[in-house]
Amino acid sequence: MFAFYFLTACTTLKGVFGVSPSYNGLGLTPQMGWDSWNTFACDVSEQLLLDTADRISDLGLKDMGYKYVILDDCWSSGRDSDGFLVADKHKFPNGMGHVADHLHNNSFLFGMYSSAGEYTCAGYPGSLGREEEDAQFFANNRVDYLKYDNCYNKGQFGTPDVSYHRYKAMSDALNKTGRPIFYSLCNWGQDLTFYWGSGIANSWRMSGDITAEFTRPDSRCPCDGDEYDCKYAGFHCSIMNILNKAAPMGQNAGVGGWNDLDNLEVGVGNLTDDEEKAHFSMWAMVKSPLIIGADVNHLKASSYSIYSQASVIAINQDPKGIPATRVWRYYVSDTDEYGQGEIQMWSGPLDNGDQVVALLNGGSVARPMNTTLEEIFFDSNLGSKELTSTWDIYDLWANRVDNSTASAILEQNKAATGILYNATEQSYKDGLSKNDTRLFGQKIGSLSPNAILNTTVPAHGIAFYRLRPSA
């Protein structure tokens, strides 16, 4: 087996392409919420959104931070005589303002969708050339979030400058309305979005669309490996495919602007529990948005307990906002049914001096894996405090809600008080500063200088740790 290293490139580019603060004051941590597309596609309605929001609230997920309810494509019936977008009255009989008001009255934020093209991806009216009237439509309907796609763009791509100005037109139009609207680019990473996205948007997709597969290759997602500048992003991209493309991009994201690895597939399709845990952990660690793609009215207990794992969410919502770095990657011989097999180690700094560490097993069998302080603190000099200190190891999945408790919550449609973390009452930032034990996992040991962190990681699974300085 052999390894790939990206530390030199990442360290060099950090000084050249730094990340600006939020251009509009939003997105200080990655957004969390729910989006209709992964499960429902065009089968959307007012009732679906309101029922979903009620369920998210009842299950305690809203108070964990999942506050954006995002209506994706297929909501429009065209334009009126003045050129303004019109909602489909059969799907949304009371109009979008009614949906927004219901969500706002229940402490949610409302997201909608359009495309920087003549049409949306499903063939509905797009916003290319109509940015100002469409931005005003969204503002008039009290929208808080816009997902802005890339279909039917009339060939206006091919260089970063061309794509930048096409997406900047909507950014300027949204700002002109005077309403704070989170701007989420969905241009699939085309034309190196991660270099220019932070100046005009709060997040940007960096790859083709995700599918509920961990490693399965698909000809519709033609680029693999670390092809971060894929000329045809495609769709049906596996979790590992997207993660590997994201590996070198962390230096271009941070507070106010995030690499978006696409919606979460936890609870969608037939991923194993270990695959869902690895998926959620890595999206959290690289500071991708945490957007639920599942039908929350039919969640299985194990998926619910993943979405509600506060110690993992706290990694994502860490106020320092630095995505983790892939320190090493090895291909392995025990490939899965698709011929895929690799192992990786990721590490990243956290706001309170802690460090997050992941050992990721993309192979087909459980295996012993290990790492050292020298690898974990790869940027530190020999003799530094990080390398000469002892660190307590906290397992971020050890205190996961068990399936019996999760099933009871789902059946009763009510999260029992005190079981889940409530970020409405106490933000993740405040909870971390106060050392709230629910956000740190369970201590399982310590790692001293020159020692080795050893563990066994399941196939398509992860070992996920927070390291804290010993008292």
UniProtKB/Swiss-Prot annotation:
One of its GO terms (cellular component) is extracellular region. Belongs to the glycosyl hydrolase 27 family. The keyword Glycoprotein applies. The active site is at D149, D209. Substrate binds at D72, D73, K147, R205, Q251. This is Alpha-galactosidase 5. It comes from Saccharomyces cerevisiae. It holds the Pfam family Melibiase_C. Glycans are attached at N105, N175, N270, N370, N403, N422, N435, N454. It is found in: Secreted. It is an enzyme of class 3 (hydrolase). One of its GO terms (molecular function) is alpha-galactosidase activity. Residues 1-18 form the signal peptide. Disulfide bonds join C42-C74, C121-C151, C221-C237, C223-C230. It catalyses: Hydrolysis of terminal, non-reducing alpha-D-galactose residues in alpha-D-galactosides, including galactose oligosaccharides, galactomannans and galactolipids. Homotetramer.
